[in-house]
């Protein structure tokens, strides 16, 4: 090695910097009177973790991650100082958090066909807000399948209830979206172009239940790809292949009449109710509004997480659109370079996460004052990103489901900067258990063939629930996967 290189390396090892170690998690925080500590700039994460454990006097070491200016330290302190033009004379504020806890496989529930959509009912899920009907340990999972049936499962992988057949008020084609509205009501939609509302009841013992059709909502002229529910305002958004976003009421009395041209039979045009058989009749209603503007199939639509009068939608036309749901007016359009397939609001960061056909996730600031369209790009998937969900434990966490057969967990603090701007890499990847059971855990399926993930949900009690082409619901759980600080 060149003597000058040896000298530079030696100087880096000998350099020191004052660091102020802090944590927002009270149970691992150092005493308030802990002042700045002089440490070698050559230290990396492992050495810093050892230092903090020694200062805390831990008998059993806790693995820590370290953040400087909101980003994880992935190099030595010296390399960080050099890359960011910071003097070693500066007192460096370093925050530490518990390191990632990998989510473990808990269970898998098998279906007869592809599972397109899942939702969870738990004490913390949106559908149970204001209700004491769900107790811890009585969580339910709702699945929608390509076989046209809804199923409600308990946590022991038992099917408690199944929706009726088409002749008894069920879907007549594949289901693409299913959501709990409340502990006693469900919404679903699919390739039969209808949004359907259901009453859900359980027997007292909790081992059996019924899914009974209540209302059929007509308005779309092509299949429906996704649903979003805002229970407290009795509203639903639907994203359809007909290029429109549907805006609906879950209250039959608030909904207008169904468009006669879209009703399934000539007989129904003379009646508000369709007689299915001697015991079943289902009300038919129309949309509050159809939001027009997209020029290609709409893949996803959601409510603003903090303002239910605002909606967002994404489409194969490469655009993200913002809607005023009070006036049904288009407010803003952000155009990207790729088809957008999934959508999730990150309100604490004023960002919308959009899954793309180009295998990455683009974070977009929807505010009119935003200078650029893309605030950050998350890279790691090898096929289309079709489902997104927020981490219920951390404002920095996000999970994605992809046609590559994996779910990836992202921490918005785990970023780096390249010529294209801020780029994030996933902190954990969850593969399909079905591959492992086939003895093919390390084999790569081209494009995720046979194991494509179609839907993912992240619930505080149940964990990470995903479903897809392998005809399974898969549950993974890790307590506090990401730090919430």
Curated annotation (Swiss-Prot):
Residues 252-278 are annotated as: Disordered. WD repeats lie at residues 110-163, 170-208, 219-258, 293-333, 335-374, 380-420, 448-485. Component of the NOP7 complex, which is required for maturation of the 25S and 5.8S ribosomal RNAs and formation of the 60S ribosome. Coiled coil: none annotated. GO terms for molecular function: ribonucleoprotein complex binding. The lineage of its organism: Eukaryota, Fungi, Dikarya, Ascomycota, Pezizomycotina. This is Ribosome biogenesis protein ytm1. CDD domains: WD40 (cd00200). Component of the NOP7 complex, composed of erb1, nop7 and ytm1. The complex is held together by erb1, which interacts with nop7 via its N-terminal domain and with ytm1 via a high-affinity interaction between the seven-bladed beta-propeller domains of the 2 proteins. The NOP7 complex associates with the 66S pre-ribosome. Interacts (via UBL domain) with mdn1 (via VWFA/MIDAS domain). Its main location: nucleus. It comes from Emericella nidulans (strain FGSC A4 / ATCC 38163 / CBS 112.46 / NRRL 194 / M139) (Aspergillus nidulans). Residues 255-268 have a biased composition (Low complexity).
């Amino acid at each position: 090695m060149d003597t000058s290189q040896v000298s530079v390396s030696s100087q880096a090892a000998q350099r020191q910097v004052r660091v102020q170690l802090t944590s927002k998690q009270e149970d691992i925080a150092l005493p308030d009177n802990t002042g700045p500590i002089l440490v070698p700039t050559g230290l990396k994460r492992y050495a810093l973790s050892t230092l903090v454990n020694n200062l805390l006097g831990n008998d059993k070491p806790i693995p820590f991650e370290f953040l400087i200016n909101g980003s994880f330290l992935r190099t030595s302190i010296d390399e960080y100082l050099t890359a960011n033009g910071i003097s070693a004379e500066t007192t460096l504020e370093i925050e530490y958090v518990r390191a990632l806890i990998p989510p473990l496989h808990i269970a898998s529930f098998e279906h007869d066909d592809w599972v397109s959509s899942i939702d969870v009912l738990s004490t913390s899920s949106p559908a149970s807000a204001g209700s004491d009907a769900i107790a811890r340990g009585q969580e339910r999972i709702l699945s929608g399948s390509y076989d046209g049936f809804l199923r409600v499962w308990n946590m022991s992988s038992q099917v408690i209830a199944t929706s009726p057949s088409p002749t008894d008020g069920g879907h007549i084609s594949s289901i693409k979206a299913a959501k709990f509205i409340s502990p006693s009501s469900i919404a679903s939609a699919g390739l039969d172009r209808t949004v359907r509302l259901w009453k859900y009841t359980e027997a007292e013992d909790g081992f059996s239940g019924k899914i009974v059709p209540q209302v059929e909502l007509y308005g779309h002229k092509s299949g429906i790809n996704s649903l979003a529910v805002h229970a407290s305002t009795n509203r639903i958004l639907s994203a359809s292949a007909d290029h429109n976003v549907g805006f609906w009421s879950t209250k039959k009395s608030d909904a207008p009449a169904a468009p006669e041209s879209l009703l399934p039979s000539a007989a129904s045009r003379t009646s508000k109710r369709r007689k299915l058989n001697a015991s079943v009749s289902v009300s038919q209603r129309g949309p509050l509004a159809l939001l027009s503007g997209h020029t290609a199939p709409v893949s996803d639509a959601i409510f603003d997480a903090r303002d239910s009068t605002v909606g967002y939608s994404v489409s194969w036309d490469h655009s993200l659109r913002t809607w005023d749901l009070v006036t049904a007016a288009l407010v803003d359009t952000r155009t990207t370079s790729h088809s957008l397939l999934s959508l999730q609001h990150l309100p604490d960061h004023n960002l919308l996460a959009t899954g793309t056909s180009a295998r990455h996730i683009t974070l977009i600031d929807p505010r009119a004052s935003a200078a650029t369209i893309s605030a950050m790009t998350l890279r790691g998937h090898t096929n289309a990103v079709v489902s997104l969900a927020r981490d219920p434990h951390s404002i920095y966490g996000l999970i994605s489901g992809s046609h590559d057969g994996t779910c990836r967990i992202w921490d918005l603090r785990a970023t780096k900067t390249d010529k294209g701007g801020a780029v994030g890499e996933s902190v954990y990847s969850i593969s399909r258990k079905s591959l492992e059971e086939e003895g093919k855990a390390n084999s790569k399926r081209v494009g995720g063939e046979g194991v494509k993930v179609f839907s993912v949900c992240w619930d505080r009690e149940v964990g990470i629930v995903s479903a897809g082409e392998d005809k399974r619901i898969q549950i993974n759980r890790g307590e506090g996967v990401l730090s919430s600080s």
